């Protein structure tokens, strides 16, 4: 009976990650980009390091006014169709626009489509943003990260990884923990468990090194990855950590199941009594 229970618990582990939510990306807000432009009409880059590597053209006043008009239609009047219509009028004149102006225009398209839950068109629009060059490096990196998140949400895991790697190619410092987690999620969903293991383990270790508690969802993901890799000792170790951090009955029961799988019946029985 105990062995059957153990097998059932182990089988459940394979599907445990399905209950973990994938964060919906917080897109950079078009109004923020417009606010930045109000302060940068002289064409300077967003940060000093960009000045050494990129010469970004100016967002001209007439283009700014049309983008602001589209934003007003979408945000204040709630008229998405009118906002899209205004942007399409701008797009019809894109042959006379510079790279930065086109990027800002597609950013607005993406923002409006995203808020209207038209994710396919939002993806298409944001992808066009990073096709335009030159644009401010910070703007490009923000868009690349949003593309990675939105592609993950849409199940485009290869694209998620590609956009993260493009982001990393522009990043001068270490890879942030949030990037590692998203990469691990994408590799896991792509059934590339070894790569997923590397990234989630680094993310958890980095977070703990800063004295912070890993997100519960990260540990659920790490546990699921180790399960797929048939590494029961590591699954057990993650569950021990989850029991200590979150003290949930389901984790106690799953830990008991893992002790049973590893032949440690005494610990299994002790855990079952505790649970």
Label each residue range with its predicted role.
Residues 15-17, 22-124, 139-142:
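N-terminal leader/linker segments that initiate helical-solenoid repeat arrays
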Residues 52-58, 91-98, 130-137, 165-173, ...:
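Solenoid-like repeat scaffolds
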Residues 59-68, 98-106, 136-146, 172-182, ...:
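Generic helix N-cap/helix-start motif at coil->alpha-helix transitions
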Residues 73, 113, 151, 187, ...:
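Residue at a conserved register position within TPR or TPR-like alpha-solenoid repeats
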Residues 77, 116, 154, 190, ...:
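Structural motif corresponding to the intra-repeat A-B loop/turn of tetratricopeptide repeats
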Residues 79-80, 119, 157, 193, ...:
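TPR-repeat structural position
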Residues 218-275:
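Long, internal scaffold/assembly segments composed of regular secondary structure
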């Amino acid at each position: 009976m105990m062995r059957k229970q153990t097998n059932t618990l182990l089988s459940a582990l394979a599907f445990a990650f399905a209950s973990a939510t994938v964060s919906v990306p917080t897109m950079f807000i078009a109004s923020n980009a417009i606010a930045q432009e109000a302060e940068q009409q002289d064409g300077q880059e967003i940060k000093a390091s960009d000045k050494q590597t990129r010469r970004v053209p100016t967002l001209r006043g007439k283009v700014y006014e049309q983008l602001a008009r589209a934003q007003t239609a979408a945000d204040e009047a709630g008229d998405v169709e009118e906002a899209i219509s205004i942007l399409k009028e701008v797009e019809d004149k894109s042959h006379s626009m510079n790279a930065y102006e086109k990027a800002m225009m597609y950013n607005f398209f993406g923002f409006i489509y995203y808020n209207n839950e038209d994710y396919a068109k939002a993806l298409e629009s944001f992808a066009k943003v990073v096709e335009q060059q030159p644009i401010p490096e910070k703007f490009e990196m923000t868009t690349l990260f949003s593309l990675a998140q939105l592609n993950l949400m849409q199940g485009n895991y290869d694209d998620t990884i590609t956009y993260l790697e493009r982001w990393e190619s522009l990043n001068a410092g270490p890879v942030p923990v949030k990037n590692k987690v998203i990469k691990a999620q994408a590799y896991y969903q792509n059934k590339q468990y070894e790569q997923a293991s590397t990234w989630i383990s680094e993310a958890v270790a980095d977070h703990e090194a800063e004295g912070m508690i890993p997100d519960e969802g990260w540990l659920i993901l790490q546990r699921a990855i180790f399960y797929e890799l048939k590494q029961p000792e590591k699954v057990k170790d993650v569950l021990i950590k989850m029991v200590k951090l979150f003290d949930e009955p389901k984790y106690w029961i799953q830990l008991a199941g893992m002790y049973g799988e590893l032949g440690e019946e005494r610990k299994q029985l002790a855990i079952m009594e505790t649970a």
